[in-house]
Amino acid sequence: MMKNHRRERVVRDRTKNMRKLPLLLLVFLPLAASAQAPSAPAASGPPPAISIKTAGMKHLAGLLPLDWDAQAGKLYLEIQHLGPDGKSPDLLYTNSLPYGTGSNDLGLDRGQVSDGRIVRFERSGPKILLVQRNMAFRSSSADPAERLAVTQSFPESVLWGFTVAAESPDGAVLIDATDFFLHDAHGVSDTLANLKQGAYKIDASRSAIALDDTKAFPKNTEVEAELTFTTDAPTPGNFVHDVTPDAHAMTLRERTSFIELPPPSFTPRRFVPRAGYFPSSYRDYTTPLGDPLDQLFILRHRLIKKDPNCVNACEAVAPIQYYVDRGAPEPIRSALLEGARWWDQAFQAAGWAKGTFRVDILPAGADPMDVRYNIIQWVHRYTRGWSYGEAVADPRTGEIIKGNVTLGSLRGRQDYMIAEALTAPYMDASAGQPHEEGHHPGEDPALQMVLARIRQLAAHETGHTLGLAHNFAASSVSQSDSVMDYPHPNIVLDANGHIDLSHAYTVNIGAWDKVAIDYGYREFPQHTSADAEQVALSNILSNADGAGQVFITDEDARPFGSAHPHAHLWDNGPDPAAELDRVLAVRTAALNNFGEAAIRPGTPMAQLEQMLVPLYLFHRYQTEATIKEIGGLDYRYNLRGDGLPDPSIVDPAEQRKALTAVLKTLAPQTLTLPESILALLPPVPPGYPRTRESFPSHTGLTFDPIAAAESAADLTLTVLLDPARASRLIEYHMRVPASPSLRGVLEAVSSTVAERPEAGHSMSSEVERAVEFRAVEAMLALAVNPAASSQARAIVRWHINDILRQLTTTPAPQDTAEAIHRAALIDRINEFERAPEKFVPAPPVEAPPGMPIGDDEDF
C-alpha cells in the first residue's frame, strides 16, 4: 500500500517537472542535433521475420515451436495462432520437478507436479502477455453479456510479459522466453523460506536451459531448466544441508509444460460426498436463485466406448495406460506392476473389457515427465517419507490429463525392519541359521511382507491418480475393504504362539474400490438421458449402502479429536477394543522373543534400539482407533432423501469396553521393558548417531526406558484427553446417561496410573510414576486449553483438586521414591492452582515418528 502510494507521488512529481521541459528543450535541442549529426538515427522499425531471426538456430517443432540460440544461450518460443483479437487458443500450463531435493522435510520430490492452469498468450503492440484465466468464477449462460459480466467481476493473472522478437506475415510471433523458463515457477525459494532454511534466490550465472530434456511435440512443449538457488546465510538450514553437497548452492531442475487442451467431448460427472472422489469446483453465477452456486465435479480420466451402446465388457477407444519407472529395481518393479494392475478388476466390474486399465514398464528413453505418460515413479529420499498420487487435471472439467504417482523407496526398508523386529530371525550363525546364508526371495517372510505392502501401496497411490480419496472406514468395516485405506500390518500368532507375517496385507482391489470406480467410470449407453444417468449413479451408491459399505475420509479421521468410530489410520478390524487386545498380545509375544537375533551378526548392538522403536510402539495406532469409540459419533455423509441412517452416539457399552482396553496401554505391565532387553542396549557407537527415529532420552547417551514409556503414554493421553473429545463426553453423557462421563474417564486414568507393583520399589513402579506425572500434565493442559468447553475445563480442574486432596490427606508412603514423587505432584498442582491463567503445561514427550516422515496433509 505504501509502495504504491509513493509511486503515484513520483509520477505526479515527474509530470509537474515536465511542464518546465519545453524551454530547456529549445535551448539544448540544436546542440543535441549537432552532436548526433555524424550518425544516422537508429530505426526501430518492425521486428524481423522469424525465419531471418532464427537462421542458424536449432529448431524444435511442436505445439509451441522452440528455437535455441546456442551462441547467446537464449531459447525462443514461437506462438503461431494468435487470433484477430490478439489472443492465442487456451493452453494447459504446468510446472514440475524432474530433479528433486530428496528431503521429506522440504517436500520437493523428484517428479512432483503442479496443478494445471488455463493460460493464453495475448498481444498488445510489441508486448506478449502470458495470462492465466480465472476458472474459479464462471457463467454457463448462453448470453455473452452475462458471461462478460462474470469475467469482468474477478481478476485474471498476468504471469509474464515478453517482447516480440520477430514475426511472420501469417501472424506468428517469436518471443525470447529465456528468462521465463529460468524463473522459479515451482516456488522452491518460497518453500525454503517458509521452512526457515534460508533466503535462497536463483543465481542466473549458475543456471541454464537444460537442452537435453527440452522437447516439443504436437500436443505439448516441454522446457527444462537447471536452476541454482543460492544463499548468503552463514549457516543454511539443516534440511538443505542434509541433502546438498554445498548447502549454499542447491541445484535442481524445473520443467515448464504447455499442453494442448483435450477436445470438448468429455462429460464432467457430479461430485457426491459419499462416492469417494476428490472434487473439482467452481462458482457458476448463472445458476437459478435457490440452486447451488458452487458446482462440484469429480476428478477422473476420459474413457470412451468403441461401441456407444455397449453395456458390459465394453472396449475403450483408448485404454487408461500407466507406466512404472524403469529406475525401480526387482523385485520391487514386479510388485509395483502387479499392485497397480489390480485396478483393472474394478474397471471390469464397472462394465469395461479386460485390459481397459493397463500398467507396463516405461519404454526405454521415454521421458517420465512427459504429460503423455501416466507414471509410477520410484523416488529416493534422505529419510523415509510419504508416497502420494497427484494428477494434472483440466480445471474446466476435472478431466485427469496425467496421473503422477510418487513412491518413496525407504518405505520398504522400514517395513523390512519392522518384520525383523517382530520375528528376530537372525539366530546364532554357528547354529547354521539359513537366513544368514541368504534366503531365496520366495522363502524370506520379511521380504514377502514388504512386497505385499508395496503391491498395496502401488494400488493405493494409483487410486489417487484415478481421482479417488482415502476411505479410512474400510479397514474397520468388513464390507468396505479397500486399498484406499492406510493398512496396518495384520500380524497374527500361529498355533504355537509364533509371529506369522503371511497375512500382513490384503491382495487385490477391494469391494469399496469397485463401487467407487463404478460411480466414476461407468459409461451409459448412448442416448441415456441425464436424469436416467443420475438415477443409475445414485443406485450404485444406494446398493453399496444397502450392502453395509461405508465411506469416511480424511477430515473425519485425521484429527486427534475426531469422533467417527470407524474412521482411523493404520488400524484393523470391526471391533477396535478387541483388536487392541489382540495387537497387545502380538506385541507381548514379539517383545518376549526380542533380542540380538533381531539384527544380523556384525551389526552394532546399539541398532537394537532402532529395531525396538516400532515394536515397543506397535499398538500406537490401534490405540487411537479404540479411543475414538470414546465420545464417538457414528455418522455418514447424508443427503436428504438418500435413506442413510441419522448420526448416533456410540453404544455406551462399546465406549466402556474401549476405555478398558485403552487403559491397558497406560499400565506398568505394558510399558515396562524386561531386564533381558535393557541389558542388551549400549549407547550408540561412532558413526551411528541418534536420530529422530530414536527414543527420547533423559539419560544422555544411554537408552532411557522411562522416557520411552513416557512417550508411549503421551501417545494415548494426547488422543484420550483431546479437548474436542472431552467436550463431547459431557454432551453425550447428558443425552445418553449410560455413556461415559468426562469425570469418569479422568478417574479411570488416575486410578490406572496410580498402580504400583511390588509396593512401589521396582522398575515398573518407576515407569508408572513417570506415567502418572505425564497423566497429570495432560490433565493440567486440558484444564487451560481454550479449545475445550468451559464445562470441560471446570470438570478437569475439579478432578485435579480431587487428586491434590488425595495426595495431601492419605498417609505418607513408606517408599522414599514414592514419597518424593508425591511431593513433586503436589508442587506441580499447587503451581497450577496459584495462577491457572499463567500456567504453562509441559509438552508431551515426543515419540519417534510412526507414520512416514514429512507433511501428510496432501497424501
Predicted regions and their residues:
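Positively charged n-region of N-terminal signal peptides that target proteins for export
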Residues: M2-K3, K16-L21
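Acidic, Ala/Val/Gly-enriched low-complexity intrinsically disordered segments
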Residues: E8-D13
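Auxiliary tRNA-acceptor-end handling modules of aminoacyl-tRNA synthetases
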Residues: A37-A328, A346, A353, I361-D415, ...
